């Protein structure tokens, strides 16, 4: 039989933390509806100004990224966006630089690209599962910083 040590009341730094209340479904739906309207307006501007827009959704597995994305894109013009799920890297992608598959998914001018999963999610997952060393992780972070700077500088 085993026992776990547990701090006494008052010994834990989380004792005084006020956990936020989860919004009710109606509030969530209202927020999604508002975001969808704003995104539809933005999509028109993106098309007119010929801007490429990359939207990356990251989060825990089974957190609902896909269902949120489905709700958000439901009313968008499908001619001007695409969706990709960034699964584990393929054998070909493993032979290429870490950010290759993300460069390959960059949207063309006037379109959105929604990525379900992103480079930080992949990098953190690889470190967590022992597939890369701390040094490789640090190199990956530097690559990400350069990639994000290129995206910001070049629209």
In which residue ranges do the predicted regions lie?
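Glycine-rich phosphate-binding loop of ATP-dependent small-molecule kinases
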Residues: 2-155
């Amino acid at each position: 039989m085993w026992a776990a040590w547990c701090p006494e009341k008052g010994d834990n730094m989380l004792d005084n933390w006020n956990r936020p209340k989860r919004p009710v479904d109606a509030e969530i739906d209202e927020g999604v509806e508002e975001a969808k309207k704003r995104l539809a307006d933005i999509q028109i501007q993106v098309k007119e100004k010929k801007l490429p827009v990359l939207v990356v959704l990251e989060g825990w597995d089974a957190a609902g990224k896909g269902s949120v994305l489905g709700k958000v894109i439901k009313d968008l013009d499908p001619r001007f966006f695409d969706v990709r799920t960034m699964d584990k890297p393929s054998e070909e992608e493993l032979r290429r630089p870490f950010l290759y598959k993300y460069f390959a998914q960059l949207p063309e001018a006037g379109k959105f690209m929604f990525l379900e999963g992103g480079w930080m999610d992949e990098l953190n997952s690889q470190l967590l599962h022992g597939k890369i060393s701390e040094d490789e992780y640090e190199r990956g972070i530097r690559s990400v910083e350069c990639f994000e700077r290129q995206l910001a500088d070049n629209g």
